[in-house]
Amino acid sequence: MKTCNVDIRLLDSNDIPEIAQAFRELGWNKPASQYAHYLVEQALELRDVYVAFVEGTFAGYLTICWKAGYEPFREKNIPEIVDFNVLPQFRRMGIGSQLMDKAESEIAMVSRIAGIGMGVTADYGAAQ
């Protein structure tokens, strides 16, 4: 696995066009409105969105829902890691691991347990 210097930080509005364009080029339906909604949820402290950049280029992201959508997690106040993506050209570089490490460290400040949702149908794409 090749490793690289990755900058991981919270999503801001300036990131949205580049993120939406990156997924549009892959043919994935992840419009700018999705990230604008995430930004609103982030401002309301419902979700944190961590974005990864390699040499200034968007490489991937992961979100933490502080009040899980999955009822068994929500009932026990377990934060949920959802919508975790690394662009294909940046896979096998440790970016996903670094995003997950960041999520785990943030969650550890409020919970000993983290939940994660996984898509298991072909339209979700490759697990990373």
Per-region residue spans from a language model:
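Short amphipathic alpha-helix that is part of the acyltransferase structural core
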Residues: 1-33, 53
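Active-site rim helix/loop that mediates acceptor-substrate recognition in acyltransferases
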Residues: 28-53, 69-70
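Conserved beta-strand in the GNAT
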Residues: 51, 57-68, 80, 85
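Conserved acetyl-CoA binding element of GNAT-fold acetyltransferases
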Residues: 74-88, 115-117
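Conserved acetyl-CoA-binding loop-helix of GNAT-fold acetyltransferases
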Residues: 86, 92-105
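Conserved active-site alpha-helix within GNAT-family acetyltransferase domains
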Residues: 97, 120-128
